[in-house]
C-alpha cells in the first residue's frame, strides 16, 4: 500500500510540474503602408518577474535561447529590413555570467513586408522563444502567429503552421537587431529619501 501511495504521489507531482503555464500572452496586428507593403506587429505581455529574450545573440552565442521569428509562405512576400524590437535592454545576469539581451513586462517586434502576391489573406509566423525568472527557465517553446491582411479571414494559427510543416516547407528566419544596438539597462545609484 505504501509503494502505491509513493508512486501515486510521484505521478501527481510530475503532472503538476508538467502543467506550468506560459507567463506570456502574444498578440498580432497589421499596419498597412500601401497596397503592397505592411508592417507586421507582434506584442508579448510578460508576467512580472519573467523575461523573454531578444533576437540578438549573447556573447559567443551563449546564454539564453534568443527569440526567433520564422515566416512561412515566403514565395508570396519578402521580408524588408530587420525585425525591429522595442523594449529590449542589456543587463548583466549572474547565472549566465554575461550581459543578456531581454524584455521585461512587454515586448514589441515590427517586421516590414512587401507582397509578391496581392491576393494573399494572411501571413503565418512561428515565434520560438524562452522565458526565465530569477530561479528557473521554461523550455523554449513555439507560438503560432497569424497576421491577417484580410480581417475577414478565419484561420487557426496552429493548424496553418502544422500544414506548412506537413508540406515540408522550410520557413525563413527574420533577421533581428545587432546586440551592439541594444542599450545597457541604467542602474540608479541614487537613494530614495
Place the predicted regions along the sequence by residue.
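N-terminal hydrophobic targeting signals that begin at the initiator methionine
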Residues: 1-2, 20
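Sec-dependent N-terminal signal peptides
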Residues: 3-14
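Extracellular/lumen-exposed scaffold segments
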Residues: 18-193
Amino acid at each position: 500500500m505504501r509503494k502505491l501511495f509513493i508512486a501515486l504521489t510521484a505521478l501527481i507531482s510530475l503532472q503538476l510540474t508538467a502543467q506550468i503555464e506560459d507567463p506570456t500572452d502574444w498578440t498580432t496586428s497589421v499596419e498597412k503602408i500601401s497596397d503592397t507593403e505592411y508592417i507586421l506587429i507582434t506584442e508579448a505581455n510578460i508576467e512580472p518577474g519573467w523575461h523573454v529574450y531578444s533576437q540578438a545573440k549573447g556573447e559567443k552565442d551563449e546564454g539564453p535561447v534568443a527569440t526567433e521569428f520564422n515566416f512561412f509562405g515566403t514565395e508570396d512576400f519578402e521580408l524588408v529590413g530587420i525585425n525591429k524590437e522595442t523594449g529590449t535592454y542589456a543587463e548583466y545576469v549572474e547565472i549566465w555570467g554575461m550581459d543578456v539581451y531581454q524584455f521585461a513586462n512587454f515586448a514589441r517586434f515590427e517586421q516590414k513586408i512587401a507582397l509578391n502576391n496581392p491576393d494573399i489573406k494572411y501571413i503565418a509566423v512561428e515565434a520560438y522563444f524562452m522565458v526565465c525568472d530569477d530561479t528557473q527557465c521554461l523550455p523554449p517553446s513555439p507560438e503560432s502567429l497569424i497576421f491577417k491582411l484580410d480581417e475577414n479571414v478565419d484561420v487557426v494559427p496552429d493548424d496553418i503552421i502544422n500544414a506548412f510543416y506537413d508540406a515540408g516547407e522550410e520557413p525563413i528566419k527574420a533577421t533581428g537587431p545587432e546586440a551592439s544596438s541594444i542599450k545597457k539597462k541604467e542602474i540608479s545609484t541614487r537613494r530614495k529619501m
